[in-house]
Amino acid sequence: MLIAITGTPGVGKTTVAKLLAKKLNYEYVSLKDFALEKGCGRRVNDEVEVEIDELAYFIERELKGKNAVLDGHLSHLMPVDLVVVLRAHPKLIGERLRERGYDREKIGENVEAELVDAVLIEAIEEHENVIEVDTTNKSPEDVVEEIVSLINSGIKKRVGIVDWSEVYDEIIPYLRLGGE
């Protein structure tokens, strides 16, 4: 089974994906590294630009039929069996991205993307099997246990559990300040 771990930058994708792969005894695949290795990604400043169709081709050709956890904020656009969309409180995302040295504009873009469910909506448009997991106030180990429990119980779709509209008024001034 190919499992995509996706979400807005700062939700904990890499940590959760590595732990989940280890727990399930699956291969861990960083989409950035995979794209660079296959020649369908290139470094531009601090980021990797990816040709999505080419990356999907290589995923299909080299990983289909294998057990792997794909880590990356584009993983929900790949040919996978299950998409896990990780979510986190927008302010928490802003704090994490500030700690990583993101500039104000990038922080604002990502906090807003989380606030309006951007990645979740894309995942639902691309796939039937989508599970949404709120990582706020949970350890990575607890998030992995929740994912494994959902997989083992046969749940293939669970969306709509996160609603940031309740914190919208609190987040808008935060966005104007660039996450400060």
From Swiss-Prot:
InterPro entries the record matches: Adenyl_kinase_AK6 (IPR020618), P-loop_NTPase (IPR027417)
Single GO molecular function: ATP hydrolysis activity
UniProt EC number: 2.7.4.3
Signal peptide range: none
UniProt: ATP binding residues: G10, G12, K13, T14, T15, R100, K138
One GO-annotated biological process of the protein: ribosomal small subunit biogenesis
Ranges annotated as spanning the membrane: none
UniProt catalytic activity: AMP + ATP = 2 ADP; ATP + H2O = ADP + phosphate + H(+)
Region (NMP): 30-50
Pfam family for this entry, one: AAA_18
Catalytic EC class: transferase
UniProt keywords, alphabetically: ATP-binding, Kinase, Nucleotide-binding, Ribosome biogenesis, rRNA processing, Transferase
Region (LID): 99-109
Subunit composition and interactions: Interacts with uS11. Not a structural component of 40S pre-ribosomes, but transiently interacts with them by binding to uS11.
Protein function: Broad-specificity nucleoside monophosphate (NMP) kinase that catalyzes the reversible transfer of the terminal phosphate group between nucleoside triphosphates and monophosphates. Also has ATPase activity. Involved in the late maturation steps of the 30S ribosomal particles, specifically 16S rRNA maturation. While NMP activity is not required for ribosome maturation, ATPase activity is. Associates transiently with small ribosomal subunit protein uS11. ATP hydrolysis breaks the interaction with uS11.
Family assignment from sequence similarity: Belongs to the adenylate kinase family. AK6 subfamily.
Name of the featured protein: Putative adenylate kinase
Record organism: Pyrococcus horikoshii (strain ATCC 700860 / DSM 12428 / JCM 9974 / NBRC 100139 / OT-3)
